[in-house]
């Protein structure tokens, strides 16, 4: 399996080992566009892997802070209570760059930037950039993708 993320179309495509499309999902990448620098709040390009899978068995809407469940489940009332929170929900696929000097090591390290593919709240619009660097998905879609891919799956982000 391989994950391809096309930034211009805001689509994530899961591809099998024979190159056939298994499934496509609408996503939301960074509102600042693409870029690899730490602190840019951009989505990094290039070849990555899924370094860690976080959230197995958690309920849909589980809120994560620093990759740990908070015990909260997202709803609109919680959203109103914490309007500026960066909502990381349901499941996390933590990415690691595979290209030293481009998206790995130093000031361009995807993993040290905490770039994930993760679930988003119901108010987040898919198909348009809106994150602060991560790839957001609908909660039902991240559960589906999470269950289909193992750690070390290749992720290609095209921008």
List where the protein language model places each region.
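Exported/periplasmic cell-wall-interacting domains
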Residues: 60-159
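Well-ordered beta-strand positions in beta-sheet-rich domains
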Residues: 24-26, 47, 114, 154
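Short, solvent-exposed loop/turn elements at domain surfaces
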Residues: 35-36, 58-61
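Short, surface-exposed secondary-structure junctions/capping segments
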Residues: 35-53
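N-terminal post-signal-peptidase region of extra-cytosolic proteins
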Residues: 1, 26-40, 72-79
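A structural motif detector for short, solvent-exposed N-terminal "entry" segments of globular domains
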Residues: 1-33
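Soluble periplasmic/extracytoplasmic beta-strand elements of cell-envelope proteins
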Residues: 4, 13, 49, 92-94, ...
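Extracytoplasmic
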Residues: 7-9, 22, 45, 88-90, ...
């Amino acid at each position: 399996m391989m994950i391809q993320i096309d930034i211009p179309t805001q689509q994530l495509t899961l591809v099998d080992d024979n190159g056939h499309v298994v499934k496509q999902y609408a996503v939301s990448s960074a509102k600042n566009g693409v870029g690899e620098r730490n602190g840019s709040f951009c989505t990094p390009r290039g070849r990555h892997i899924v370094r860690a899978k976080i959230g197995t068995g958690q309920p849909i809407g589980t809120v994560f802070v620093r990759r740990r469940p908070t015990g909260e489940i997202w709803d609109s009332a919680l959203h109103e209570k914490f309007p500026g929170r960066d909502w990381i929900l349901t499941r996390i696929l933590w990415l690691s760059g595979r290209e030293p000097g481009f998206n790995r090591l130093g000031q361009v390290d995807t993993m040290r930037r905490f770039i994930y593919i993760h679930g988003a709240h119901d108010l987040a619009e898919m198909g348009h950039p809106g994150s602060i660097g991560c790839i957001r998905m609908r909660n039902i879609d991240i559960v589906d993708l999470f269950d289909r891919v193992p750690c070390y799956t290749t992720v290609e982000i095209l921008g």
